């Protein structure tokens, strides 16, 4: 987070946030303090994708001021930044009221054309860019690349290989892993047959994406550290290249995986294996320390093992070069479970911090658990390491030599810890069994400059990629029960949540009880308090407030909660603006806890003859609608009160058919635990018939009261139908589509319209009373699987005229139904986009590429990418829904996944269906699913 970048000073936000209003299109845009008028207009036109002018602005007193010249606008900006200078911690915001200009018109005279590249770097970066342009003025292509990517000058200026035009002859193989901004592939050198790993990072505008900027800066740091390192126990870098589409990083391919992944496969290691690996880790650390480099993130996930048992240190994104006195480094880098006390307390650290982390890795290898695994709260772990005099538990089964070795590594005073060379002479390392031979290491080879056309352009490559490859491989092979996070104060945070070593919950201690055992008068560094605050949970607040005198003020500071929530992309609902940010987060956390941990009961509705393609839950009415391949829409009563006529005559006319009322109730905490029993809490009511093809989608309309009056269906027979639930007859058939209709949405009684998507590549808006087509949206080049409206707008102030579609053409489009025009296109999926869902100006899409992407309507930028573990089998994501606390998805595997939307992880997996799930919907504390296995399941939370 930017507010943690300088822990010794108060947070100073260099931006102001301006609410820009163009008709019904409202966006909050951040502007840098040194932006010019031309840059301002350029940024506005790029965001709104049309020529505009600023008509009015709102001053600090809330009055609207009419703009007469560009000087008025710049004077307003100056005023806002002066206000911010007076109160640096206050978030200053205002409003710009915009007007759209005709295409040939231009806003008030601008110094920049809309097509020029706008670079908003600080003065140092600007100077660096100028120097770089002077050095490369003979290469126009290179300059174009720099303007196109706007990468940090650290990469462009210090690593000239990034703008080389040499071709790299390699063939892309199987995908090894995916991340939010790129994919990792196995590569084959087409000339030599050499295998290597390649991470391709798609080029986007990093100025608007701080997460990507941190990733690229981490890459640059690794390249800088590793460009001259060559050692048998350090991952070998092959090179880096940059073109106009991708940043490609080439590195040694390690097929064995990391220590953490091996622990997940084989369990704890024997002491002999630990000795073999520890000796090689020490050899790598000795080389690094001799070359004035501290790794700062030694842990099992960053130590790779090849097929011959050779250890390779990887992931140098947290590393630091030093010279002379090394205690000057006071920033917090690494993963807390493996951190030395001086790192967490930020009292200065050096090579000895790597030695402490090595001891933690030995404990990890001996137990298959991270150190401090008996403490469940990450914040409590950090406090425990910093404030107590204890050391990690040493496994009792280890030898006396191992005990002595670990006690040396775990000296609380870093000055008392031996260095790597001294530990290599310790009996624990020297006294290997006579019949044990260390792995034979072949000589290290380097790339010669005359082979740059066939391999990589230089010998510098990004090591973070190698760690990402192996961590993403581990993610497919193990179940992570807790969260491991890399944290950084001095240079922003860089999160790594992909691997969490298994821990035993039976030995877990209460974080509150651990903290309460410590003195409450200890005063911790304010930077540590802020860092712990980032990991805080609401049920932990009261305990932390007793830790030291700073906490009461911090916990009640809603501005800090605002920054905390903003960093996690947590928003407040516009209908609940009066609640505090603290209350907002606690509310979301409670919602997550219910879905992530509470017991699940489920019932099974049997009666469909073929697969179920659509379901709809009407929870307050105790009703379920389901349709599918058998061409019938079935209506179910799940209220359990079958004698109370609350469905306006529907229950009174039940068609009692045998074989349609088979209900199984199961209790489930996870995908593996369930028990079966029979019940009659739910039953089939009747079917709505009339379609000649399978029913693909269903929606409904309520009467003026609360009962459901009309049902809307979309079918593969090219038609849509409106049914009356009271008479069970067709009221109207819509026939304007030319191919199968895939999705239907009723837009509410105010609009009284329906919007439908079809494989005929169109979206149609039509009147639900007359059936007349009001507008047709065209722009997709393939069939459309899904169309959705913003559920916050639909359930709040009404339909907001924006819809989102998912198509066979691999894109998801945002449409304005008033102008029948495409507003934005999301193109980050690599295969068909099968489903989408819209909530509070954000969209979740699921694809045949096996990924789920959360993205923002206003910018079209990816916020997060969620990757089910079965992605390697290319299992399609057919259905997805989300709200402010979670994402729920499913698809080809029949497994339902509940995702933590803010930590990008799978928090719960539910089994129950044996084939593809095509539809799901959740509402309050119920979830309903429909599957190709002919079953409809209803999941309810205790």
Swiss-Prot record:
Name of the protein this chain belongs to: Mitogen-activated protein kinase kinase kinase A
Subunit structure: Interacts with ubcB and ubpB.
GO cellular component: cell cortex; cytoplasm; membrane
Major subcellular site: membrane
Organism whose genome encodes this protein: Dictyostelium discoideum (Social amoeba)
Cofactor(s) essential for the protein: Mg(2+)
Transmembrane segments: 513-533
Reactions listed under catalytic activity: L-seryl-[protein] + ATP = O-phospho-L-seryl-[protein] + ADP + H(+); L-threonyl-[protein] + ATP = O-phospho-L-threonyl-[protein] + ADP + H(+)
Binding-site positions, ATP: 176-184, 199
EC assignment: 2.7.11.25
Keyword Hydrolase (UniProt): no
Biased composition (Polar residues): 487-498
Similarity-based family: Belongs to the protein kinase superfamily. STE Ser/Thr protein kinase family. MAP kinase kinase kinase subfamily.
Post-translational modification: ubcB and ubpB differentially control ubiquitination/deubiquitination and degradation in a cell-type-specific and temporally regulated manner.
Renumbered residue ranges of the record's region Disordered: 107-144, 441-512
Keyword field contains Transmembrane helix: yes
Source organism superkingdom: Eukaryota
Bias type Low complexity, positions: 441-486, 500-512
Stretches assigned to the PB1 domain: 15-96
Record's function text: Regulates cell-type differentiation and spatial patterning, required for the proper induction and maintenance of prespore cell differentiation.
GO BP annotations listed: anatomical structure morphogenesis; intracellular signal transduction; sorocarp development; sporulation resulting in formation of a cellular spore
Domain Protein kinase, chain residue ranges per copy: 170-429
Topological type in the membrane: Single-pass membrane protein
Domain F-box: 518-564
């Amino acid at each position: 987070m930017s507010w943690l970048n300088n822990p010794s000073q108060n947070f100073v936000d260099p931006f102001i946030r301006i609410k820009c209003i163009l008709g019904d299109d409202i966006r909050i845009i951040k502007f840098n303090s040194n932006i010019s008028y031309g840059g301002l207009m350029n940024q506005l036109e790029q965001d709104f994708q049309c020529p505009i002018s600023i008509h009015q602005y709102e001053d600090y007193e809330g009055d609207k001021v009419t703009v007469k010249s560009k000087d008025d606008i710049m004077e307003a900006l100056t005023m806002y930044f002066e206000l911010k200078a007076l109160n640096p911690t206050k978030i200053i915001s205002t409003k710009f009221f915009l007007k759209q200009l005709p295409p040939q018109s231009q806003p008030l005279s601008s110094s920049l054309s809309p097509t020029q590249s706008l670079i908003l770097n600080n003065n140092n970066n600007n100077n660096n860019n100028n120097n770089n342009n002077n050095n490369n003025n003979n290469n126009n292509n290179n300059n174009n690349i720099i303007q196109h990517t706007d990468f940090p000058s650290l990469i462009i200026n210090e690593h000239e290989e990034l703008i080389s035009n040499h071709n790299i002859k390699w063939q892309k193989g199987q995908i090894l892993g995916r991340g939010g901004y790129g994919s990792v592939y196995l590569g084959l050198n087409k000339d030599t047959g050499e295998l290597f790993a390649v991470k391709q990072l798609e080029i986007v505008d990093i100025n608007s994406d701080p997460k990507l900027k941190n990733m690229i800066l981490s890459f640059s740091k690794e390249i800088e550290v590793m460009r001259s390192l060559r050692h048998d126990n350090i991952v070998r870098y092959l090179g880096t290249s940059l073109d106009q589409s991708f940043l490609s990083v080439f590195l040694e391919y390690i097929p064995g995986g990391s220590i953490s992944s091996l622990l997940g496969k084989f369990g704890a290691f024997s002491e002999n294996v630990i000795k073999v690996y520890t000796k090689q880790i020490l050899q790598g650390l000795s080389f690094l320390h001799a070359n004035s480099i501290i790794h700062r993130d030694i842990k099992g996930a960053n130590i790779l093992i090849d097929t011959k048992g050779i250890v390779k240190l990887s992931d140098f994104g947290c590393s630091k070069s030093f010279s002379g006195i090394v205690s000057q480094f006071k920033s917090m880098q690494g993963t807390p479970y493996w951190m030395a006390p001086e790192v967490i307390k930020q009292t200065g650290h050096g090579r000895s911090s790597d030695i402490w982390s090595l001891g933690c890795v030995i404990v990890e290898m001996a137990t298959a658990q991270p150190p401090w695994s008996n403490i469940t709260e990450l914040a409590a772990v950090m406090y425990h390491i910093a404030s107590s005099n204890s050391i990690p538990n040493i496994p009792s089964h280890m030898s006396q030599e191992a005990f002595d070795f670990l006690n040396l590594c775990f000296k609380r005073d870093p000055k008392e810890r031996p260095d790597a060379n001294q530990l290599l002479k310790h009996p624990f390392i020297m006294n290997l069994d006579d019949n044990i031979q260390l792995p034979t290491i072949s000589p290290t080879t380097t790339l010669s400059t005359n082979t740059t056309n066939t391999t990589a352009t230089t010998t510098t490559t990004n090591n973070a990629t190698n760690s990402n490859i192996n961590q993403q491989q581990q993610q497919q092979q193990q179940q992570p029960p807790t969260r491991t996070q890399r944290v950084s104060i001095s240079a922003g945070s860089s999160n790594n949540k992909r691997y969490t070593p298994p821990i035993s919950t039976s030995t877990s201690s209460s974080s509150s009880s651990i903290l309460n055992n410590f003195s409450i008068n200890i005063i911790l560094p304010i930077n540590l308090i802020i860092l712990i605050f980032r990991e805080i949970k609401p049920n932990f607040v009261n305990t932390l407030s007793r830790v030291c005198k700073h906490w009461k003020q911090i916990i009640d500071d809603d501005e800090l909660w605002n920054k905390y929530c903003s960093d996690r992309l947590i928003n407040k609902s516009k209908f609940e603006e009066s609640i505090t940010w603290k209350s907002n987060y606690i509310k979301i956390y409670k919602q997550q806890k219910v879905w992530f941990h509470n017991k699940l009961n489920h019932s099974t509705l049997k009666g469909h003859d073929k697969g179920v393609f659509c379901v709809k839950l009407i929870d307050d009415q105790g009703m379920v609608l389901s349709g599918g391949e058998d061409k019938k829409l079935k209506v179910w009563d799940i209220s359990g009160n079958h004698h109370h006529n609350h469905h306006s005559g529907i229950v009174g006319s039940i068609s009692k058919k045998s074989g349609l009322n088979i209900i199984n109730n199961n209790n489930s905490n996870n995908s593996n635990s369930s028990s079966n029993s029979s019940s009659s809490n739910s039953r089939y009511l009747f079917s709505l018939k009339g379609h000649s093809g399978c029913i693909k989608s269903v929606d409904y309309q309520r009467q003026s009261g609360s009962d459901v009056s009309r049902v809307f269906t979309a079918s593969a027979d090219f038609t849509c139908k409106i049914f009356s639930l009271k008479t069970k007859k067709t009221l109207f058939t819509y026939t304007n589509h030319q191919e199968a209709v895939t999705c239907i949405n009723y837009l509410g009684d105010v609009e009284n319209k329906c919007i439908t998507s079809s494989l005929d590549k169109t979206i149609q808006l039509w009147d639900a009373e007359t059936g007349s087509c009001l507008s047709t949206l065209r722009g997709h080049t393939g069939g459309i699987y899904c169309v959705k409206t913003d559920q916050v707008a639909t359930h709040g102030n009404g339909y907001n005229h924006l819809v989102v579609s998912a198509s066979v053409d691999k894109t998801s489009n945002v449409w304005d139904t008033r102008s029948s025009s495409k507003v934005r296109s999301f193109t980050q999926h690599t295969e068909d986009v099968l489903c989408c869902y819209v909530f509070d100006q954000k969209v979740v899409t699921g694809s045949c590429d096996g990924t789920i992407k959360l993205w923002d309507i206003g910018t079209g930028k990816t916020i997060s990418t969620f990757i089910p573990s079965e992605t390697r089998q290319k299992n399609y994501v057919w259905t997805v829904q989300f709200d402010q606390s979670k994402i729920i998805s499913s698809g080809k595997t029949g497994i339902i996944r509940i995702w933590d939307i803010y930590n990008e992880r799978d928090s719960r997996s539910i089994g129950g269906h044996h084939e593809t799930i095509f539809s799901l919907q959740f509402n309050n504390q119920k979830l309903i699913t429909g599957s190709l296995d002919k079953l409809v399941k209803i999941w309810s939370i205790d």
